[in-house]
A protein has these predicted regions:
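Short catalytic micro-motifs in class I SAM-dependent methyltransferases
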Residues: 55-59
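A structural alpha-helix within SAM-dependent methyltransferase catalytic domains
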Residues: 4-7, 70-74
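A short, conserved alpha-helix within the catalytic core of class I
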Residues: 60-72
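A conserved beta-strand element that flanks and buttresses the S-adenosyl-L-methionine
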Residues: 52
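Functional-site microenvironments in short loops/helix caps that host divalent-cation chemistry
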Residues: 49
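Class I (Rossmann-like) S-adenosyl-L-methionine-dependent methyltransferase catalytic domain
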Residues: 1-46, 81-157
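A short helix->loop->beta-strand "cap" motif at the edges of active sites that frequently abuts
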Residues: 77-79
Length: 157
């Protein structure tokens, strides 16, 4: 999906914690700004019109870490920050119960691999401090069971 969207993009950069993923992206993309690093280490330069995080905030070690990444993304963006598939704290118990119903011994199998959940208030507070417009969107993919438990966040300058 993202590679299809890149046909419309003139300049692209990014980071991933996996050197393998970065090496693959460098082969496919015509981009110099691809780095293997933790998300909270991204540099503020170069800047981009839109800075996107696609379905990774759930893997960050804490909401505080995630909000540090939002700050970095905001400083790197000229126009907008888009964060997709943010796990909703209000839906946490329902989400975990659903996973327990679908996966036998879920808690045992996924011990130590917790998802990180966020409140919408965290993003609203950030938007207030940054003087940003903050919009939440519910993903619309009927084939993806996780949609019920996540939201997307658009922060606009």
């Amino acid at each position: 999906y993202l590679f299809q969207q890149l046909k419309k993009v003139t300049q692209v950069g990014g980071c991933d914690y996996s050197q393998t993923q970065i090496a693959l992206a460098k082969k496919i993309l015509n981009a110099n700004d691809l780095q293997c690093m933790e998300a909270d280490q991204i540099a503020e330069k170069p800047v981009y019109d839109v800075v996107l995080s696609d379905s990774v905030f759930q893997y960050f070690q804490s909401p505080e870490y995630g909000m540090r990444v939002v700050e970095k993304m905001w400083n790197k963006a000229k126009k907008m920050v888009v964060i997709t598939e943010i796990h909703d704290e209000e839906m946490k118990e329902e989400h975990l119960n659903h996973r327990r119903q679908c996966v036998e011994n879920y808690d045992e199998k996924y011990k130590g691999l917790d998802k990180t959940f966020y409140t919408k208030e965290m993003f609203l507070q950030f938007a207030d401090r940054a003087r940003a417009k903050c919009e939440f969107v519910k993903p619309q993919n009927d084939l993806y069971w996780n949609n019920k438990y996540v939201f997307d966040c658009y922060l606009t300058k």
